[in-house]
Structures are given as C-alpha cells and as structure tokens.
Amino acid sequence: MPHVTTFKFKAISGERQAVIDSFRRWQQERMPKVNGFIRSVLASSLDDADEFMVTVLFDSTESYNANSSDAEQGAWFQELRSHLVADPEWFNGNVELLTTV
C-alpha cells in the first residue's frame, strides 16, 4: 500500500528561497538514491509565502521508513530545519484513494 507523508512548516523571515533551494538539492542529490519514492509537491500558502506544505508519496511505508532513517536524509533535514521557525507538523498515513488525470 502506498505511503503518504505531509508536513507543514514556516520559513524564517528572509529564508524562503533557502527552503526552496533545499528541496531542489534534495531532487538532484537524494532523489536518485531513494528507493520507492514516487513524487512530491512543495507548495507555499497564498496567504503567507513563508508558509509551506509538502506532500511526499512512497510505494510503501517500508520505503518511507528506510529513507527517513538514512543518515544522508537526516543531514538534509537538519539543513532544512535551520531555515524554519519551528519543527514541522507531520502527518503520515496510508493512501486509501489516489486520483490523477
């Protein structure tokens, strides 16, 4: 069963671009190494451009757990966290229905 993780966070004022750049680096450096990764979406709020929501889809919870426990992933997250006001608010779950065009 596919696994979805969603997290919401706010960038420190003036560090919005650093957050976006961090996700771009993840795509270039981490994504090719991550087994089971399907897709991700990084979105910023229409009401506050420093507020973000990320949704990441993996083929299974096992793939998600393998990535989240990887030391390189941990280092990437700590770099991202240095640009955030507080720890993200997380949601992890099983995909019950997935609709695409």
Locate each region found by the language model:
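An amphipathic, aromatic/His-enriched active-site/gating alpha helix that lines ligand/cofactor pockets
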Residues: 25-38, 57-91
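Short, well-ordered beta-strand segments in beta-rich or mixed alpha/beta enzyme
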Residues: 2-10, 40-70
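Short, surface-exposed ligand-recognition loops at beta-strand->loop->(often short) alpha-helix junctions
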Residues: 10-23
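Glycine-rich beta-strand-turn "strand-cap" elements at beta-sheet edges
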Residues: 1, 39-50, 76-101
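Short, flexible segments with low predicted structural confidence
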Residues: 2-4, 19, 35-36
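Generic structural motif
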Residues: 12-14, 59-61, 95-98
